[in-house]
């Protein structure tokens, strides 16, 4: 068995979208960007942005929808 874990630190790219399943469970989706500074072949630093799609469920989904908005800093672990 293998186990993978990811930690993301970045900012929301758009406002969270809250919806509910037919069973009544809250689901919140948003995009977030992480930024990294890397040297290119010429030795100059370049900012590299990577985008992630994030989905939260139930109470976390409701809290994210209530307290986060585009540009909010976020820490995601999962």
For the regions a protein language model found, what residue spans apply to each?
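Single-stranded nucleic acid-binding surfaces, predominantly the OB-fold ssDNA-binding core
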Residues: 1-78
């Amino acid at each position: 068995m293998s186990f993978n874990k990811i930690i993301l630190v970045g900012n929301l790219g758009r406002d969270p979208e809250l919806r509910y399943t037919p069973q009544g469970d809250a689901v919140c989706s948003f995009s977030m960007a992480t930024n990294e500074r890397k040297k290119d072949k010429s030795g100059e630093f370049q900012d590299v942005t990577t985008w992630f799609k994030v989905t939260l469920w139930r109470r976390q989904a409701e809290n994210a929808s209530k307290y986060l908005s585009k540009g909010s800093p976020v820490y995601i672990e999962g």
